[in-house]
Amino acid sequence: MLGYVHLTAGRPVLERRAAAGMTYWALEGDLDGGLFPGRRLRRWIGRLERCGVSHAALPPGREGNFAPLRPVLPDGLRLALLPQLLNALAPAGDTALLLADCADSRALLAAQLLARRFRHLRLETGAEQEALERQLLRQLGLTTGGGPAAVTVTFGPPPREGLPLYLTPDCALRQEVRYAWLDPSQAPPPEGLLSLLHRACRLPEICVKSVETLDRRRENLYNAT
């Protein structure tokens, strides 16, 4: 069973909800208040566990406070929506740079998506990079290389060229992504809920509205429009 934790003001409320055919437990409220905030938090974590919750979308940067619940992070969701994220950033240039510590299946998927959008793709993917390059050549006829990057997509190493796009486990602390349902009358969905839907293979069609870099050295807002 999946869970969703949202810290807000007010008394905590735990309730079962449904979205896009997926049921989950939602816990919302102030979990840090009271005379013994640590005790309150542990009590509510215990209630989630008794409801069968083992994985949950948790407040960014607070994942360790909710052990033994395992976090559902947004990096997988963002990888799945990489083309829309690139549209929101709208980088001006024909070269992309992909950074990763190893050329795993996630790096391959990102490389394939980038190769379909940019004329040139540079790779710095550590171990197995040559195998990744051969696979891209065989599948897409792509030879890697190019000039300065208009955008850097990273799974870990710090970006140093062009507009950054983070697919790291802590991506929610580095960039804020705003989403919208196709029906504009519906309230914008929180990324935590979308991450749960993606994990459950229940993600409906959604729109990426904007990507805001939270790194204080690069406080820029890039809108899809």
Where are the predicted features?
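N-terminal glycine-rich phosphate/adenylate-binding segment common to multiple enzyme folds
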Residues: 41-70
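Well-ordered, non-membrane alpha-helical segments in soluble/globular domains
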Residues: 34-50, 79, 83, 107-111
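N-terminal basic/disordered segments at the start of proteins
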Residues: 1-23
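Short hydrophobic beta-strand segments
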Residues: 1-7, 55-58, 94-103, 122-125, ...
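Adenosine-phosphate binding glycine-rich loop
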Residues: 17-19, 28-30, 166-225
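Glycine-rich phosphate/diphosphate-binding loop of Rossmann-like nucleotide-binding domains
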Residues: 91-148
